[in-house]
């Protein structure tokens, strides 16, 4: 296993001129992540990221499985959308999102089985291009408001030299604590992903960016990273 020693943490500026300073309200910081029950029905909008909306690849009456692509686009700035439950497509229709955007959506009624798609298998990564393709096929997008497709972020232009990977664990919005819980509960998954990115994309330096109200999260990540370097 390739390893990397974390170089540091980017802390939020303690005093910012202007703006509105609201309470953090991180009341869920000590609550473990829980798995929600399987819903009876899901509505999957085809616009879940910045860029070109997906086109539905299924129709009403189709049987679908977990992980099956139900929407895709051949445009670069886009990412496929997968079924989150198994069941039957009950409708392909227009839907209005919380932000007022009107888009096509795939409605699936659950069969309660959460059956995995037969075509699901670990990606065969042999280099940079196959890795970026795997990221794209996974449908990964950012958790920010834009939902920026991850494969686009990771594709460095050939005329650019990027030597530092900054992993964003900052949560500037009040109430949100998902990044913090991920750092505590899935620290090795985060670090192993960092190792993979460093090795395949050739980063020389890695920094995890976090506010100074997350000392425990960074302490856990740094301890595991330092231990792995020592064992290597």
Question: PLM ranges: what are they?
Answer:
Residues 65, 71, 90-91:
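Hydrophobic beta-strand signal
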Residues 74:
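Cationic-aromatic interfacial patches
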Residues 1-57, 107:
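N-terminal, Lys/Arg-enriched amphipathic/low-complexity engagement segments
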Residues 54-63, 67:
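Short histidine-centered loop motifs in beta-beta connectors
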Residues 25, 35, 45-48, 61-62, ...:
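Generic alpha-helix detector with strongest preference for long hydrophobic helices that associate
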Residues 77-232:
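Iron-sulfur-associated redox domains of electron-transfer enzymes in respiratory
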